[in-house]
Amino acid sequence: MTTVMKFGGTSVGSGERIRHVAKIVTKRKKEDDDVVVVVSAMSEVTNALVEISQQALDVRDIAKVGDFIKFIREKHYKAIEEAIKSEEIKEEVKKIIDSRIEELEKVLIGVAYLGELTPKSRDYILSFGERLSSPILSGAIRDLGEKSIALEGGEAGIITDNNFGSARVKRLEVKERLLPLLKEGIIPVVTGFIGTTEEGYITTLGRGGSDYSAALIGYGLDADIIEIWTDVSGVYTTDPRLVPTARRIPKLSYIEAMELAYFGAKVLHPRTIEPAMEKGIPILVKNTFEPESEGTLITNDMEMSDSIVKAISTIKNVALINIFGAGMVGVSGTAARIFKALGEEEVNVILISQGSSETNISLVVSEEDVDKALKALKREFGDFGKKSFLNNNLIRDVSVDKDVCVISVVGAGMRGAKGIAGKIFTAVSESGANIKMIAQGSSEVNISFVIDEKDLLNCVRKLHEKFIEKTNS
């Protein structure tokens, strides 16, 4: 049996936690034939790397770089002391850490002197989080008596294009690179989040990259299971911080999990699911700090529970853009032009809805992308502030609603269920919220809508009470 185990930043947030993870891994190795580990950077390290790289560019202060290097060395040295008992293994790992930190310092000083931070350089800097945590975890596994080696994503066979910052996989050489190690009983500890180009340059895989790395390795190895170890005991019916009665969901289908992940569930990134789904590899979400908890199993089965609705997820810090114009009626390609313009400004559209009259299109984007979105629309369609029809503009007006949120109701039981949308919207009304936009995908396992963010708590609690608590009580 081949198992891929991915551990997130909180799971390896300290030396004690790294040793705890190493114990989980070695226990699994004794139970299974082959184990591959994918690891994130220690918690807060990636954010610190983002910050120092920007400071090196903007402030160009070498002293700040020196302070950061001292901080990062102390953090990882402390982790080594806590995670590893053998003095020999400690010294081996410290040599690797010293070499990489020296490399990082040179790059940051180069950014400060040149006043230049290219996407390629930024990816290289951000890669150090995982490149520093992986040797420590590998050392802790060796300290517990198992053979292990730390590998970078490229060394493990993740080959990408040159789209630095959000690289796409060109091909996988995972089987060729990892199978010989597994046959020798070695546990590879692979850096999540990063790959390499054909030319050998380090790339990052974008947000959620470590989960995605685990899925790619599972896909490449035809693994029996992919385990995502995090700081919660699986996927919940909603955010427990909003609804204290939220409960763990034992099983989800790939489609349900993808919808939940896309619409705000932080446990899993939606890109993780597709490689596993293509080969039918189960994904198990587990809690590092409660390893005996069963977690949530994600498979191809559309298991119908007693609840039509399985979960409710939310996205905050978004804005609703409403585009109006009778000139859009019957004009082919208008929507394509809108999305092309937004794509050129790298604006991600979270949700879309178009009225049957074709006179308006509504979009949900991140709040931080609003200005870029408006700039893109003006560049493509001209000044839509001139509201006379004589101007012959396709777009007559654009309005922006901030302080809104997206709520998504997800469940395979919704497929073909009569009257479910009406019941959902009745519950929303009872909560005192007003719906500003509605969207439903063709999968029929998700209904999403936009309301004012101030109404989010009451709305989620009412939906959870009506569709999950009452059904299961």
UniProtKB/Swiss-Prot annotation:
It is an enzyme of class 2 (transferase). CDD domains: AAK_AK-LysC-like, ACT_AK-like_2, ACT_AKi-HSDH-ThrA-like_1. One of its GO terms (biological process) is homoserine biosynthetic process. Residues 323-392, 409-473 form the ACT domain. This is Probable aspartokinase. It comes from the Archaea. Its EC number is 2.7.2.4. The keyword Nucleotide-binding applies. One of its GO terms (molecular function) is aspartate kinase activity. GO terms for cellular component: cytosol. It holds the Pfam family AA_kinase. The keyword Kinase applies. It catalyses: L-aspartate + ATP = 4-phospho-L-aspartate + ADP. Transmembrane segments: none annotated. Belongs to the aspartokinase family. Keywords: Amino-acid biosynthesis, ATP-binding, Kinase, Nucleotide-binding, Repeat, Threonine biosynthesis, Transferase. Pathway: Amino-acid biosynthesis; L-lysine biosynthesis via DAP pathway; (S)-tetrahydrodipicolinate from L-aspartate: step 1/4; Amino-acid biosynthesis; L-methionine biosynthesis via de novo pathway; L-homoserine from L-aspartate: step 1/3; Amino-acid biosynthesis; L-threonine biosynthesis; L-threonine from L-aspartate: step 1/5.
